[in-house]
């Protein structure tokens, strides 16, 4: 699963979700992509499940790019622990996504195959997404 090799601080604050995505809003590497329509957290396990779903459907045809990386640690206190006594230990890693962010890109496959593969991957996520094509930018 994806996680940073090293971070400056082990624990992070929750942060804010306001606004639209600041970067990665266009399909830059492949021909088709999956774009978010909602904001939320996507865990490293969800990213891995999406990657496996796409690769299983495409069966070595085409190329897949993962455009997000989980760089935020989420902490969790042990079960049946009373409140207080500080923040819990880091439990898993997430990426914060805002509307408009491209999550995955695929190339060298037909539009129908790309749509089906990305639809299967979207079922693994807890947020709404849409299928987008590459547009020429000057």
Swiss-Prot record:
NCBIfam families assigned to the protein according to its UniProt record, in alphabetical order: rplP_bact (TIGR01164)
Function: Binds 23S rRNA and is also seen to make contacts with the A and possibly P site tRNAs.
Pfam families: Ribosomal_L16
Designated name of the protein: Large ribosomal subunit protein uL16
Organism of origin: Chlamydia trachomatis serovar D (strain ATCC VR-885 / DSM 19411 / UW-3/Cx)
One annotated GO molecular function: tRNA binding
Subunit comment: Part of the 50S ribosomal subunit.
HAMAP family (alphabetical): Ribosomal_uL16
Gene Ontology CC entries for this record: cytosolic large ribosomal subunit
Gene3D superfamilies for the chain: Ribosomal protein L10e/L16 (3.90.1170.10)
Annotated GO biological process: translation
Keywords recorded for this protein, A-Z: Ribonucleoprotein, Ribosomal protein, RNA-binding, rRNA-binding, tRNA-binding
Keyword rRNA-binding tagged: yes
Record-linked InterPro entries: Ribosomal_uL16 (IPR047873), Ribosomal_uL16_bact-type (IPR000114), Ribosomal_uL16_CS (IPR020798), Ribosomal_uL16_dom (IPR016180), Ribosomal_uL16_sf (IPR036920)
Membership in a protein family: Belongs to the universal ribosomal protein uL16 family.
């Amino acid at each position: 699963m994806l996680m940073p090799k090293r971070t400056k601080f082990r624990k992070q604050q929750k942060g804010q979700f306001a606004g639209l995505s600041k970067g990665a809003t266009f399909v830059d590497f492949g021909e088709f992509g999956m774009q978010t329509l909602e904001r939320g957290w996507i865990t490293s396990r969800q990213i891995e499940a999406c990657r496996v779903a796409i690769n299983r459907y495409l069966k070595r045809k085409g190329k897949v790019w993962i455009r997000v990386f989980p760089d935020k640690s989420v902490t969790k206190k042990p079960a049946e622990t009373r409140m207080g006594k500080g923040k819990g230990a880091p439990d898993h890693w997430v990426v914060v996504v805002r509307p408009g962010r491209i999550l995955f890109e695929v190339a060298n496959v037909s539009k129908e195959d790309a749509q089906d593969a990305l639809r299967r991957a979207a079922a693994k996520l807890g947020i709404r997404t849409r299928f987008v094509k590459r547009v020429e930018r000057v």
